[in-house]
């Protein structure tokens, strides 16, 4: 999915240290119940510290001995940091275990002395609702994409048109503005009268969007893009119809997010 929406510019390499040489998975299960790892007032740092402490103890006790040297070599000699660690928590998508992305600044290390940078906590409850799409959403946070939904469900300024606003079972393309913010696409400005041709957002070449600027606001502009409703199982299957969409972008909004009630994209 990431390779597709980035026009092949981002290739995500996923490593599964719990997978043996025959391709079978022996799940790494941490001791205790999920509530034992629940955040308190100190927040996510406490949760991640407990997870890494439990992993380290399992490693010391030989519980992780099923991991072969060849499997761990995918981490050996890296830059000293695991870019993104995904943790599955069995249970409802609620409270401290609502699926989310966070950064960890602790000094604990695992597997060849590697520190953890970003991590994605994924509840099995959210997987039941949104399938692998929720994994895409949280990993896009790791890559730098902001939330485009409203916290508290107060309005839907973007809706199903961007993966960072709604998470259907099959992921949709992010808006071209989001892909541009991540450095994957450029959006030319339509500054003179004339005929302009848009390639659909799902295309791999051509202009996927045009910017329309106004003299009324320096930090605000409109974006025009063309979306095509796809077949079941394909990205963009959940958009309601094919057609032209126009949205406003306000670069003055802090953190370029809709989450806190302001409209970065509307």
Residue ranges of each PLM-predicted region?
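Active-site-proximal segments of metallohydrolase catalytic domains
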Residues: 1-110
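Extracellular hydrolytic enzyme modules, especially secreted metalloproteases
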Residues: 83-239, 250-252
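Intrinsic-disorder/low-complexity accessory segments
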Residues: 232-266
